[in-house]
Curated annotation (Swiss-Prot):
The modification Phosphothreonine is found at residue 63. It comes from Mus musculus. InterPro entries: CCDC138 (IPR038798), CCDC138_C (IPR048750), CCDC138_cc (IPR048751). It comes from the Eukaryota. This is Coiled-coil domain-containing protein 138. The modification Phosphoserine is found at residues 64, 484. Residues 260-339 form a coiled coil.
């Protein structure tokens, strides 16, 4: 059994095969004198092969793909490729070192050559098995060429195989068999050297291919290293971003927790506020129920009062009927008395013939006690019914609730019927005691005030004008008759004065009646002058408030009465003087009628400066009442005052001071050094 060559660790199969084939596998002890002949023979053969054309073998290597596949797919070369690449550049030293251990035993016998050839074929089969185990096969064409070459050098290859196999199998074999001397004539054939070169060239090509592959692999490694560096940098950036995101996440969670706590706190506050609102709603509901009960009670009381009022009206009608009956009875008794007196009857007839109103004064002279009774009734009616004048806009002054429209209409109808009769009765007043004039005039005044909002006063224009003239001028009567004397009547002129009376209450009432009924400018001017004089006294101010004279005055506070405008303002200005009547007067002016009149007046372009200054004093005092701020805003008086303040020349310091004070009281401007309180 043939011994196989054992490869050292890291050796390539092809290199081992060459070493085992050409005797390079082990060290064979050869003497120096034997190697001298071998070396000389090798040098001669190398010189003879120097001119050998290697192009043929290179072309065969290139055109033989099986051979390239064999060496390219063979085992990896460890340390031997470097050795053979050096041998390619310097071919002489490897051959010398290889053949130091070569034992050439040439036999001339032909049979030994064939025997050795048979061994070489056996060895070739073993080597093919080795190549199959290493995953690289030699093509059939290569083995055929090698077999052809082996036939030419069968002797040399057989000897080399024996020598190498012996040296590899056992080093003791060399000692048993003596080394035969090498014949100087025996040497290596050129074909074997070419085959060695061919093998070395294949190794060289394989090394170059591996070098190129390693360079490419190195470049790929460099690129991959660069790619990994970029990925590492990207990973670092991602890690940094993740750390930032982690910090942001913690901050967001903290902020979310804070917001959650704030939300919970707000919910608690809102819940408490809702509970308070619910409690307040319950209280308001209970208050509303209470108010509703009170309203029901008031409605019941109103119904009761209405029933009582109806009863009082029925009673008043009965009293009026009784009064009429008494008057008829008195007239009947007077007529009976006149029938008993012939002289009186003759005078009555003569008076009828002359169509003179003699019976009236005659009647008046005889009815003094009746007039006293009538004045009592007039005072009672005036105080209980007529003096309760309804405002033109109900509910503005915040006073008592207005009467029913039907009741007010009834009162106005009665006043319309009474005024013509009262105007006729003025002609008797000279025959009546002066103390009865005031109740009579008061009754006329309150009857006129009841007609302020009536639409029928236009139909009574002539009656009102006559009434005003009689009150202004007075009434004079010449013929009188004294009932107490039973002798002839003496003619004596008597006069009843009202407007020019020395009694302040009568004069004040007469002035108001003149202002209410007269349209002549000269009469009105005298009436306002008299009113201003009367208002300088405390009694006059008291009467002004008692008779509610503001609506009468406001009817003349308009631009159409341009000549009387200053007198009207003066009369109102007298009421603004510091006194006990100032505050009631300001409260009486705190209504929509007064503010509407002032608003219309302030809108007048180019209003006289003196009138504006006087009006500003009144408005300044009214602005001190907080409840009047709404009236200032409703009628936009505050805006007009601001515009007047903006356009007023600084030289008019008095007006500027009043305007600034008024606006300051309304909270529309800041206090400055110019604002001072006026005492006018």
């Amino acid at each position: 059994m043939e011994r196989r060559v054992v490869k050292p660790p890291g050796q390539d199969m092809v290199v081992e095969r060459l070493k085992s084939r050409y005797g390079l596998a082990g060290r064979c002890p050869v003497e120096e004198n034997d190697m001298t002949g071998v070396w000389a023979a090798l040098m001669n053969q190398q010189h003879e092969l120097s001119d050998f054309d290697q192009t043929k073998y290179k072309r065969r290597i290139v055109t033989s793909p099986d051979g390239l596949d064999t060496y390219s797919s063979g085992d990896k070369v460890g340390s031997s490729p470097r050795y053979y690449s050096d041998g390619r550049n310097h071919p002489t030293p490897p051959f010398c070192s290889s053949f130091k251990h070569l034992n050439v035993n040439c036999l001339d016998d032909e049979l030994d050559s064939f025997h050795d050839l048979k061994k070489w074929e056996t060895e070739k089969e073993l080597m093919e098995d080795d190549h199959r185990d290493g995953a690289s096969k030699i093509t059939k064409q290569s083995f055929k060429e090698m077999e052809t070459d082996a036939l030419m050098t069968s002797m040399a290859s057989g000897l080399e195989t024996e020598c190498c196999s012996g040296s590899i199998d056992s080093p003791l074999k060399q000692a048993v068999y003596p080394r035969p001397k090498v014949s100087k004539k025996q040497g290596l054939l050129p074909h074997e050297i070419n085959q060695i070169y061919d093998e070395l060239y294949h190794i060289h090509m394989k090394l170059q291919y591996e070098t190129t592959a390693q360079k490419k692999f190195a470049e790929e490694l460099q690129k991959r290293e660069q790619f990994l560096a970029e990925r590492e940098q990207l990973l670092f950036s991602h890690e940094t971003a993740l750390s930032k995101i982690k910090g942001v996440k913690e901050e967001v969670l903290t902020r979310f927790q804070i917001l959650k706590e704030q939300h919970g706190t707000e919910i608690e506050h809102l819940t408490e506020a809702l509970k308070e609102k619910n409690k307040e709603n319950k209280r308001m509901r209970s208050s509303f129920d209470t108010l509703r009960e009170l309203n029901d009670n008031l409605r019941k009381q109103l119904n009761e009062v209405s029933e009582e009022n109806k009863k009082m009206e029925i009673q008043a009608k009965r009293v009026q009927a009784r009064l009429d009956n008494l008057q008829r009875k008195y007239e009947f008794m007077t007529v009976q008395r006149l029938k008993g007196d012939s002289h009186a009857a003759h005078e009555v007839k003569s008076s009828k013939q002359e169509k003179a109103p003699a019976p009236k004064p005659f009647k008046a002279a005889l009815n003094g006690q009746v007039y006293e009774l009538l004045t009592v009734f007039m005072d009672w009616i005036s105080d209980c019914h007529l003096s309760k004048v309804e405002p033109e806009e109900p509910g503005v002054d915040g006073g008592k609730p207005p009467a029913k429209p039907s009741q007010r209409s009834d009162i106005q109808e009665k006043c319309v019927k009474l005024l013509p009769m009262m105007t006729e009765q003025l002609q008797w007043m000279p025959l009546v005691s002066a103390k009865l004039h005031e109740p009579f005039v008061r009754f006329i005044y309150w009857s006129l005030r009841q007609l302020d909002a009536s639409a029928r006063q236009s139909t009574m224009a002539s009656t009102l004008r006559r009434l005003g003239e009689d009150v202004f001028k007075g009434v004079t009567m010449k013929g009188t008759q004294d009932n107490s004397l039973e002798h002839s009547v003496e003619n004596k002129a008597k006069t009843a004065v009202f407007f020019k009376s020395s009694s302040l209450p009568l004069r004040f009432l007469s002035t108001l009646i003149v202002l209410r009924t007269v349209t002549q400018a000269d009469y009105l001017a005298q009436a306002f002058d008299s009113l201003c004089l009367d208002l300088k006294t405390d009694e006059g101010k008291t009467l002004f408030l008692e008779y509610q004279a503001i609506p009468v005055i406001l009817k003349h506070l308009r631009i159409s009465s341009k000549g009387l405008l200053s007198n009207v303002i003066d009369s109102l200005l007298q009421m603004t003087v510091e006194s006990k009547s100032l505050q009631p007067f300001l409260e009486a002016c705190s209504n929509s009628l007064f503010f509407r009149t002032c608003s219309v007046l302030l809108r007048t372009p180019k209003l006289d400066l003196h009138i504006l200054e006087k009006l500003s004093i009144i408005l300044q005092k009214l602005s001190k009442i907080k409840s009047n701020k709404k009236l200032f805003e409703v009628f936009t008086i505050h805006l007009m005052l601001q515009e007047i303040q903006r356009t007023t020349h600084p030289e008019h310091a008095f007006l500027c001071i009043n305007l600034n004070s008024t606006l300051f009281n309304l909270g529309l401007t800041k206090c400055n050094s110019l604002v001072t309180s006026t005492s006018h």
